[in-house]
């Protein structure tokens, strides 16, 4: 994303004139409309986003669409992502939640094994006998047993019930994914129940009702054994 730094007095004048011009056919976007119109009127400066030591541009990604946001997060799960969260030369200045470390429980033979592969798991998360693959779990997410989470983003406070399967999805904050829910596997059901991006990413909000798969009696018996 992009940031513009302006003085309060200057921004008041600019915003006022932009509001007066609101009937004009523009999106009133800082980068596309407002700044270009000001270049010949007032001093405008750009920060050269370049690493002189490495002789390369620093990381920048436009996340103005859901697909772009999704791909930027998926890139973090790679072995050598373009944006390295662990680079001591570029620390993140952000709020750190007061939460315990992530925890993975159950190591039984078969499906009930709490594990995460090629994923970013935030503090406060508990993965209870489920597999997380290529996904980003935000703080305080709880995934109950026998779930499969693949290439997905789970926002803070999400709860996932047992036997749920989620693939290529963004689950909104504090959503309770019900037991047996299937998200990202059946395109017709996904489009009928959720928002689906042009890139095929399923976006699930608190008001959605995910498709529930029929209960596998053998799996249920094994769970209760």
Predicted segments — roles?
Residues 20-225:
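Left-handed beta-helix
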Residues 1-15:
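Single conserved hydrophobic/aromatic residue that forms the stacking wall/gate
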């Amino acid at each position: 994303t992009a940031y513009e730094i302006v003085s309060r007095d200057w921004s008041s004048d600019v915003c006022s004139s932009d509001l007066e011009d609101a009937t004009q056919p523009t999106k009133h976007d800082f980068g596309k409309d407002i700044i270009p119109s000001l270049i010949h009127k007032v001093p405008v400066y750009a920060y050269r986003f370049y690493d002189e030591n490495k002789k390369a541009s620093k990381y920048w990604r436009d996340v103005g669409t859901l697909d772009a946001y999704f791909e930027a997060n998926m890139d973090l799960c790679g072995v050598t992502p373009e944006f390295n969260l662990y680079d001591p030369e570029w620390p993140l200045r952000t709020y750190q939640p007061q939460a315990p470390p992530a925890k993975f429980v159950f190591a039984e033979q078969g499906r009930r094994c709490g594990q995460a592969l090629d994923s970013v798991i935030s503090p406060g998360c508990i993965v209870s006998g489920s597999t997380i693959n290529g996904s980003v779990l935000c703080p305080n997410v709880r995934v109950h047993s026998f779930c499969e989470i693949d290439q997905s983003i789970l926002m803070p406070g999400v709860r996932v019930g047992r036997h749920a399967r989620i693939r290529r999805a963004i689950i909104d904050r504090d959503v309770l994914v019900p037991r047996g829910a299937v998200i990202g596997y059946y395109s017709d059901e996904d489009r009928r129940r959720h928002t689906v991006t042009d890139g095929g990413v399923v976006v699930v909000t608190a008001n959605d009702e995910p498709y529930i798969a029929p209960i596998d009696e053998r799996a249920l018996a094994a769970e209760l054994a």
